[in-house]
């Protein structure tokens, strides 16, 4: 025990002691540790959807649960690796790629409360039977077996170790599509409102008024002047800043302009592919074009 440490170890140990000392000092002074974000970016089969783990010194909140059982297991692994206690799972949207993973996560973390804003929960619960009918056979063993529903969130914020996560976007015609603003780190987790380097999913916004409300949400995000923006869906390597907000806004404006000009969905698809040749998630364009040209029901 009294053997001298190798020289290369000494600076590392000293740095670790200083770091732990500073952390203890901050904790002792009542200053909360800065929150951190970990993005779990699910693959193309899950529409490139993101789950985001927001961590404090001891506890964490998960934003969105993933689409498949496999997605949720990867999220669970990230939570376990973090060493933090998962206090809350928040579901920001009523789409199945945001909540199908809840069953697995509830089994792994039964003490974590699972919540969604009331408009999200209302739409989610109403659509659940149809979503299971559509996606259950497609996902097979990766589908939920006994779906878990969130509870309605009281108020419009979450708290993590004394720091607030504000739930925004609840006061418009797309109130079921929220986003999260974390003022202490000037970060937005954009949910289904923000797409990074992808075709935006327009099948669920079938009127000009709904798409205008979507654009207004993007303006609301930009007005916060966030330092960090995590898209709800993104290709790997997408910058976590306002780039994705600007991309989504420009995409919707172009879609709105081209929609009445296109003779049919095929023409609209061709035009948007030419305008965004590098964008992923082609299925979003294909379904969105067919739905908005009246060639498909959604």
Regions found by a protein language model. Name each.
Residues 2-13:
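Bacterial N-terminal signal peptides that target proteins for export
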Residues 19-25:
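N-terminal signal peptide c-region/cleavage motif recognized by signal peptidases
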Residues 27-29:
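Boundary of Sec targeting at the N-terminus
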Residues 32-81, 85, 179-192:
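Conserved beta-strand hairpin/beta-sheet module of binuclear metal-dependent hydrolase folds
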Residues 44, 58, 65-69, 90-95, ...:
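A mature extracytoplasmic/lumenal domain signature
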Residues 67, 168-172, 176-246, 250, ...:
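Metallo-beta-lactamase
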Residues 81-159:
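Active-site HxH/HxHxD metal-binding segment of metal-dependent hydrolases
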Residues 123, 223-228, 235-298:
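Accessory terminal helices/loops
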